[in-house]
Amino acid sequence: HVVAAITALKERGGSSHQALKKYKAAN
């Protein structure tokens, strides 16, 4: 799950950092 999430974030690019923070907060 984590790898898939990171891959999706990399594809988005710009909002990856913000999305990663949100993802970490969710877990």
Curated annotation (Swiss-Prot):
Cellular localization per UniProt: Nucleus; Chromosome
General function of this protein: Histones H1 are necessary for the condensation of nucleosome chains into higher-order structures.
Protein name, as recorded: Histone H1.3, embryonic
SUPFAM superfamilies the record matches: Winged helix' DNA-binding domain (SSF46785)
Example GO molecular function: DNA binding
Keyword terms, alphabetized: Chromosome, DNA-binding, Nucleus
Coiled coil: none
GO cellular component: nucleosome; nucleus
Pfam families per UniProt: Linker_histone
Organismal lineage: Eukaryota, Metazoa, Echinodermata, Eleutherozoa, Echinozoa
Family, similarity comment: Belongs to the histone H1/H5 family.
InterPro entries referenced in this protein's UniProt entry, alphabetically: Histone_H1/H5_H15 (IPR005818), WH-like_DNA-bd_sf (IPR036388), WH_DNA-bd_sf (IPR036390)
Occurrences of domain H15 (ranges): 1-27
Transmembrane segments: none
Single GO BP term: nucleosome assembly
Main location: nucleus
